[in-house]
Each structure stands twice: as structure tokens, then as C-alpha cells.
């Protein structure tokens, strides 16, 4: 009898825990995805802060020339970064217990792998938590779908690209100048500016900014005034009010006359779907482009493709980009190799006389 009572009590305790985890009455919703999200993001954030301040130099290229990335080793906020895991480690899973000592783990850039893997797991769980909360509240699932765009982008640069290139040392450093260095080297090696998926991403980001500004300014300019001229129009809104807060007909009429009639949405739901879908689809394509370039399916190459009737090259913008790419490739990892791959692999032309 005692055993039965204890089992009921334990089940009741577990039931209360489940109800608390999945309750939408909490100030912050936890959810089952949150059970994994909270420790992984806390771990990634804590290690990032500590490593950004105090991590010793990392042998990123695997050639016994460590690179400093932390504040205590001479960097500032702009130049500081979490240096990627050493090329000597490659794609190996490298937790602390795999190293002979903590010093060796730090020298080989172990914190980068720890931060990135916990971060990716955490943001994926954050996306799942968005879906879970939407489900509990009876909402549609599109918030999580929209968030999948930045999740895909982060996964592409921190995981898919290193897998394709064969080493976590090719992942994006966790810092401001490190991000720019990653972008420049990516252009040099993959010609990303000439990749159509990157172009779609640029259109998505800049177009999304433009459409967001257009929508916000149109709505703000067509508010239905509920206040006097001496009060702010914003003071006329009551949270949860049933009435429309702006006149979509007026906004439609303005924009239709500014551009042309069919450039303006007359359906608020279609408008907001478009505002969400445009940047999300663009960033999806960019993440897909990064993931294909990870395996060296690079951007378009039109180098020296225009020649005259005598076979002489007519330089185009593509040739200018090619020369810039070679310059950038020569400069990066300058101690790891003497020549960029496309220079080293070309046979020297023979000369007569």
C-alpha cells in the first residue's frame, strides 16, 4: 500500500512538472524545446564571453603559428574573435576530454567547436519552441518557418561550410573583423558575388528593408485619428481594440497613385505574407548557395570569355573581379602556402627565342 501511494505521489510530481513546462501562463514560455534550448544557449553564451575576454592564441592553420583573438591578448572589440578550431583537428569532434590537457584544448581552438555546436542546437530548439508555443495558443506555424531562414544561414556558415571544406578552421570566426575576413576569403575562393543565390539573398535583405520601411511609413501616415490636434496620434490606440487603427483604403489609394494601381496591395493578409516571405525566401536561397559553394560548386566564372577576332582578350568586369579575387587569395593564410591554388596549378607558358 505504501509503495502504491509513493508511485502516485511521484506521478503527480512529474505531472505538475509537465504542466509547468508546457504552461502558457508562465511569464516566459519554456516548452519541451526550451528544456534543451536553455542549457545549450547558456553554455554557448558563457563560453563565448569567457573566451572572447581571455582565451589564449589558437593555431588555426595547424602550422604552429597561433593567432590571438581575445581581449587580454591584445585585441579590441573590433579585432577580437573566437578563433576557429585548428586545421590539425579538421572535422573531428573535439570536446575537452579528447585533449591531453586544457592548455592543448585551448591551443587547438576547442572553445570554437563547443560554442558553435551548442549555439546551433540552441537556435534550432528556439525555432522548435516558437512552433510549440504557436501550437499551444492555437496559432498558425509560420513564425517558426520565418525564423528558419537565419537558422539555415547560421548552419550554413558554421557547420555545412566546414564540412564541405574538410575542417572547422574554415568556419566563420566569432567576431566582427573575423566575419569580414571570412567574407573576403569566401569571395576569393568561391566568387560568391557572381552566384545567383547570393544575388537573391541581397534582393531579399535589401528588398525586405525597403518593404518594411514602406509599410511602416504608409501605416503611420494613414492612422485613424482618435485624439485632438494637441495630442499624439499614437495616444489614440487602445491595446486589444477591435477597430482598425489605420485606413488601409487610404494607404492603398496613396501608393496606387504614387506608383500604379496594381503595385499596391488591397488585401492586408496578402500584404503581410509578402512582407514575411520576401526576405525569408531570399535568405533561404543564400544559405543554399553557401551550402553548395561549401562543396566548391562556385559562382559563375566569365574570366577572359570575351575575345576579339584575333583571339585577344577584351577585359570585362568579370576579369577585374578575377584579379581582385587572386589578390585576396594571395593575402589570406599567407604563411600556410606560397601561392593560391589557381596560380600554383597553372603551367608556366613556354616562350620562344
From Swiss-Prot:
Tyr-161 forms a radical intermediate that is referred to as redox-active TyrZ, YZ or Y-Z. C-terminally processed by CTPA; processing is essential to allow assembly of the oxygen-evolving complex and thus photosynthetic growth. Fe cation binds at residues 215, 272. The modification N-acetylthreonine is found at residue 2. Chlorophyll a PD1 binds at residue 198. The D1/D2 heterodimer binds P680, chlorophylls that are the primary electron donor of PSII, and subsequent electron acceptors. It shares a non-heme iron and each subunit binds pheophytin, quinone, additional chlorophylls, carotenoids and lipids. D1 provides most of the ligands for the Mn4-Ca-O5 cluster of the oxygen-evolving complex (OEC). There is also a Cl(-1) ion associated with D1 and D2, which is required for oxygen evolution. The PSII complex binds additional chlorophylls, carotenoids and specific lipids. It holds the Pfam family Photo_RC. The record marks 190 as: Stabilizes free radical intermediate. GO terms for cellular component: chloroplast thylakoid membrane; photosystem II. InterPro entries: D1/D2, Photo_II_D1/D2_sf, Photo_RC_L/M, Photo_RC_L/M_CS, PSII_D1. A quinone binds at residues 215, 264-265. The modification Phosphothreonine is found at residue 2. It is found in: Plastid, Chloroplast thylakoid membrane. It catalyses: 2 a plastoquinone + 4 hnu + 2 H2O = 2 a plastoquinol + O2. It is a multi-pass membrane protein. The keyword Chloroplast applies. Coiled coil: none annotated. 2 of the reaction center chlorophylls (ChlD1 and ChlD2) are entirely coordinated by water. Herbicides such as atrazine, BNT, diuron or ioxynil bind in the Q(B) binding site and block subsequent electron transfer. Photosystem II (PSII) is a light-driven water:plastoquinone oxidoreductase that uses light energy to abstract electrons from H(2)O, generating O(2) and a proton gradient subsequently used for ATP formation. It consists of a core antenna complex that captures photons, and an electron transfer chain that converts photonic excitation into a charge separation. The D1/D2 (PsbA/PsbD) reaction center heterodimer binds P680, the primary electron donor of PSII as well as several subsequent electron acceptors. This is Photosystem II protein D1. It comes from Morus indica. The gene is psbA.
Amino acid at each position: 500500500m505504501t509503495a502504491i501511494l509513493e508511485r502516485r505521489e511521484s506521478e503527480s510530481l512529474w505531472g505538475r512538472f509537465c504542466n509547468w513546462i508546457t504552461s502558457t501562463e508562465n511569464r516566459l514560455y519554456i516548452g519541451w524545446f526550451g528544456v534543451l534550448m536553455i542549457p545549450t544557449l547558456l553554455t554557448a553564451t558563457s563560453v563565448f564571453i569567457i573566451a572572447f575576454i581571455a582565451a589564449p592564441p589558437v593555431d588555426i592553420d595547424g602550422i604552429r603559428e597561433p593567432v590571438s583573438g581575445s581581449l587580454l591578448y591584445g585585441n579590441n572589440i573590433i579585432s577580437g574573435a573566437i578563433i576557429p578550431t585548428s586545421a590539425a583537428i579538421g572535422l573531428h569532434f573535439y570536446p575537452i576530454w579528447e585533449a591531453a590537457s586544457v592548455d592543448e584544448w585551448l591551443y587547438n581552438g576547442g572553445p570554437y567547436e563547443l560554442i558553435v555546436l551548442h549555439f546551433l542546437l540552441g537556435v534550432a530548439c528556439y525555432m522548435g519552441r516558437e512552433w510549440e508555443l504557436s501550437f499551444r495558443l492555437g496559432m498558425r506555424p509560420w513564425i517558426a518557418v520565418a525564423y528558419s531562414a537565419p537558422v539555415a544561414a547560421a548552419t550554413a556558415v558554421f557547420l555545412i561550410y566546414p564540412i564541405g571544406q574538410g575542417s572547422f578552421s574554415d568556419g566563420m570566426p566569432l567576431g566582427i573583423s573575423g566575419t569580414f575576413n571570412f567574407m573576403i576569403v569566401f569571395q576569393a575562393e568561391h566568387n560568391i558575388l557572381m552566384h545567383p543565390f547570393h544575388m537573391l539573398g541581397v534582393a531579399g535583405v535589401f528588398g525586405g528593408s525597403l518593404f518594411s520601411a514602406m509599410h511602416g511609413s504608409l501605416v503611420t501616415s494613414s492612422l485613424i485619428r482618435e485624439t485632438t490636434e494637441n495630442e499624439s496620434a499614437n495616444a489614440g490606440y487602445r491595446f486589444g481594440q477591435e477597430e482598425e487603427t489605420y485606413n488601409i483604403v487610404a494607404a492603398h489609394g496613396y501608393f496606387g497613385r504614387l506608383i500604379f494601381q496594381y503595385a499596391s496591395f488591397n488585401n492586408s493578409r496578402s500584404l503581410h505574407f509578402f512582407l514575411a516571405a520576401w526576405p525569408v525566401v531570399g535568405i533561404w536561397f543564400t544559405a543554399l548557395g553557401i551550402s553548395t559553394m561549401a562543396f566548391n560548386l562556385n559562382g559563375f566564372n566569365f574570366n577572359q570569355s570575351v575575345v576579339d577576332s584575333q583571339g585577344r582578350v577584351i577585359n570585362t568586369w568579370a576579369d577585374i573581379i578575377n584579379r581582385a579575387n587572386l589578390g585576396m587569395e594571395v593575402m589570406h593564410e599567407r604563411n600556410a602556402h606560397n601561392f593560391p591554388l589557381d596560380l600554383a596549378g597553372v603551367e608556366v607558358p613556354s616562350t620562344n627565342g
